[in-house]
């Protein structure tokens, strides 16, 4: 009989993980399926068992791992994505997909060498390689990059945003004051004096450009000082959390080019938080309250308004009671709390509240809720708990348990500093320092999940290229390095402003100009027959590529004018020749059934234009404009401000250089703009998204 525990022991799985695995029936089934059929020493099978979506046939993947076709985590992730998109995929189809996308050692070496000699920084090179070699192991790529002495003298210098302003003068590890010397000494022994940061998203939505600023700060600060950064999920509200959001956030962070030291979650510490809550009760720093949420909010509001009116009076003088349960006996509090932990009460019966210093008159010190019952299973802990810590409890304790030295958060958390410090001192545990920075607000869009979700009724999903979600920007074709450079260019400030999206666009163009291949594409075709021309091969300058010229071509309708009434129009007219890029000049002969008859000429043209042969590749092109008409859609009802013409779809014709393109490949369509291959692409129809215009 299959013994899961023996297998986990053999694989050296930690006790925490083992306990979590043993609660998951599907995961145990996966392990049994794989390890009774294949080599029990292969740890990649364990990764497959833990990460496989229900939709895929894990036996097919197990066979491919066993045959060494799937060799690493990166190939496994990419092939699982393929299987999800292509339901009922066969062994042969999946194997063919992997082999087609797996580069030879020589090809990988060539791509790495070229990237490392590009003049970009190591981080930029790593991002390029991750995108070009998605089937290669991340650690291998980073090791290869680190072997190179990379010369960045060719690259555009970006100022070090962490060496300007207050962020450059933050405390060093060990300089942040603690309740006593022992706490500080123990902390430094655990960390070795390293900088420790964390990025703590809630897994209830997807990341956007504002998060990219926080990610760059959290990971960048740790990297600058040779420290570590955790990716920690703040998963304290099981009703709003989904597996998809956990996976999506990890994918987005890595796509931006950052590797967490470890991926953790507040739920990892739920047991510790129950013990710490008992400690607070025993110290008379917490109590069990029976007030409803509505009554609790009402009393907090009344107290806040009373302090505003009579600033010098105490709560006793005001005659207000925050909670009639505030002075409940410690033994009674402890008894009820233990019953809550044991699931003997239902949602709404009780909450654990901190017994804080109300004299501070800061609303964030009005006995915040520390733990509450939510009758809902958790994505990670399943049905182990129904008592969950509040955000205020979980963030502080998780920061402390992970020995975070610099706890970065946006400025609206400034009022929470006092409660943050109070709680950790009350618990007599290590206390990180919080430091606030301004949110990133960008023009012509909305960023919050609360405002993005209602856009669904307009057909706008979370990954819509018009949104500034990480998924949306990636789908549109915006390079991760452009996002990183943009947010770093803004610096770290406390003042909140709305940044014009045109500033962001300049970073996008700068990056795409350096990295995209130029091709020709005609989107509003006018047919021309060049009657004295012959089919021929044309070599592309500075490239080993060639395209075929044929006498029947398309040009843009806007490049031809029948009237000669505009002296500033220097392109094609009945009396003015025009140059065809990489070919030669043509002159107008006549119109024939909506087609121009032309001839090659030796005249020197005033302008050259792009063109394609009439049998070029037909493609679908999506032209995106800002989703909202106004600079700040937040003013008034943002839904009334939607630009209903922000997406136009046209048919275009591209030259043969796009053959073999893959999803997320990017091109510059000469004289038109930058475009990216969309996931809606099929073998029969390539779909392009316009990333941005040339100017």
From Swiss-Prot:
Pfam families tied to this protein: tRNA-synt_1c, tRNA-synt_1c_C, tRNA-synt_1c_C2
Q: Name one GO cellular component term.
A: cytosol
What EC number(s) are associated with this protein in UniProt?
A: 6.1.1.18
Q: Where is this motif: 'HIGH' region?
A: 201-211
Q: Per the record, what are the reactions this protein catalyses?
A: tRNA(Gln) + L-glutamine + ATP = L-glutaminyl-tRNA(Gln) + AMP + diphosphate
Is ATP-binding given among the entry's keywords? yes
Say if the entry is tagged with keyword Aminoacyl-tRNA synthetase. yes
'KMSKS' region (motif): residue ranges: 446-450
Q: Which residues bind ATP?
A: 202-204, 208-214, 410, 439-440, 447-449
GO terms for molecular function, please?
A: ATP binding; glutamine-tRNA ligase activity
Biological process annotations from GO: glutaminyl-tRNA aminoacylation
Q: Which UniProt keywords apply?
A: Aminoacyl-tRNA synthetase, ATP-binding, Ligase, Nucleotide-binding, Protein biosynthesis
Q: What family classification does the UniProt entry report for this protein? A: Belongs to the class-I aminoacyl-tRNA synthetase family.
- Protein's name in the database: Probable glutamine--tRNA ligase
């Amino acid at each position: 009989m299959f013994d899961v525990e023996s297998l986990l022991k053999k694989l050296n799985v930690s006790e925490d993980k083992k306990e979590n695995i043993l609660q998951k029936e599907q995961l145990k089934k996966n392990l049994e399926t794989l390890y009774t059929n294949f080599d029990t020493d292969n740890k990649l099978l364990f990764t497959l068992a833990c990460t496989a979506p229900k939709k895929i046939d894990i036996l097919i993947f197990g066979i491919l791992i066993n045959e060494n076709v799937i060799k690493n985590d990166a190939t496994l992730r990419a092939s699982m994505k393929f299987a999800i998109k292509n339901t009922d995929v066969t062994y042969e189809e999946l194997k063919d997909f992997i082999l087609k996308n797996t580069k030879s050692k020589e090809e990988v070496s060539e791509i790495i060498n070229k990237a490392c000699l590009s003049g970009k920084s190591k981080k930029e090179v790593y991002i390029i390689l991750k995108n070009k070699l998605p089937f290669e192991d991340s650690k291998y790529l980073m090791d290869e990059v680190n072997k190179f002495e990379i010369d960045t003298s060719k690259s555009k210098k970006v100022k070090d945003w962490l060496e300007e302003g207050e962020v450059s003068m933050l405390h060093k590890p060990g300089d942040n004051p603690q309740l006593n010397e022992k706490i500080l000494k123990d902390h430094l022994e655990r960390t070795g004096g390293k900088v420790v940061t964390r990025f703590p998203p809630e897994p209830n939505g997807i990341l956007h450009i504002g998060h990219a600023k926080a990610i760059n700060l959290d990971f960048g600060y740790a990297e600058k000082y040779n420290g570590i950064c955790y990716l920690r999920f703040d998963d304290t509200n099981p009703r709003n959390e989904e597996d998809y959001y956990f996976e999506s956030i990890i994918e987005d962070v890595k796509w931006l080019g950052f590797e967490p030291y470890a991926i953790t979650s507040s739920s990892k510490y739920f047991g510790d938080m129950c013990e710490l809550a008992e400690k607070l009760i025993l110290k008379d720093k917490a109590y069990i309250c029976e007030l409803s949420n509505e009554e609790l909010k009402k009393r907090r509001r009344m107290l806040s308004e009373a302090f505003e009116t009579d600033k010098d009076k105490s709560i006793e003088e005001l005659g207000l009671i925050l909670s009639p349960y505030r002075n409940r006996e410690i033994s009674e509090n402890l008894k009820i709390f233990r019953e809550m932990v044991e699931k003997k009460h239902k949602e709404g019966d009780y909450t654990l509240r901190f017994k804080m210093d109300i004299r501070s008159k800061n609303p964030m010190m009005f006995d915040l809720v520390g733990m509450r019952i939510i009758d809902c299973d958790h994505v990670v802990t399943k049905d182990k708990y129904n008592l969950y810590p509040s955000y205020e409890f979980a963030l502080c304790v998780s920061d402390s348990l992970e020995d975070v030295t610099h706890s970065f958060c946006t400025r609206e958390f400034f009022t929470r500093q006092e409660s943050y410090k109070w709680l950790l001192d009350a618990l007599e545990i290590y206390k990180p320092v919080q430091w606030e920075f301004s949110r990133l607000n960008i023009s012509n869009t909305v960023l919050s999940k609360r405002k993005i979700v209602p856009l669904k009724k307009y057909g706008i999903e979370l990954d819509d290229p018009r949104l500034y979600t990480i998924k949306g920007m990636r789908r549109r074709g915006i390079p991760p390095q452009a996002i990183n450079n943009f947010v770093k260019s803004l610096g770290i400030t406390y003042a909140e402003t709305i940044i014009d999206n045109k500033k962001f666009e300049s970073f996008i163009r700068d990056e795409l100009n350096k990295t995209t291949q130029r091709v020709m594409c005609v989107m509003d075709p006018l047919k021309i027959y060049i009657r004295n021309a012959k089919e021929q091969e044309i070599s592309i300058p500075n490239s080993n590529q060639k395209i075929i010229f044929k006498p029947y071509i398309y040009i843009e309708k806007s490049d031809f004018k029948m009237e000669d009434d505009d002296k500033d129009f220097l392109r094609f007219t009945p009396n003015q020749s025009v140059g065809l890029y990489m070919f030669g000049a043509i002159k107008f002969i006549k119109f024939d059934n909506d087609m121009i008859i032309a001839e090659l000429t030796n005249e020197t043209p005033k302008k050259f234009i792009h063109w394609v042969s009439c049998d070029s590749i037909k493609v679908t092109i999506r032209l995106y404009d800002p989703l909202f008409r106004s600079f700040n859609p937040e003013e008034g009802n943002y839904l009334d401000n939607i630009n209903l013409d922000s997406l136009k779809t046209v048919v275009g014709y591209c030259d043969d250089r796009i053959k073999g393109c893959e999803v997320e490949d990017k091109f510059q369509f000469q004289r038109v703009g930058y475009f990216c291959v969309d996931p809606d692409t099929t073998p029969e129809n390539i779909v392009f998204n316009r990333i941005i215009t040339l100017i």
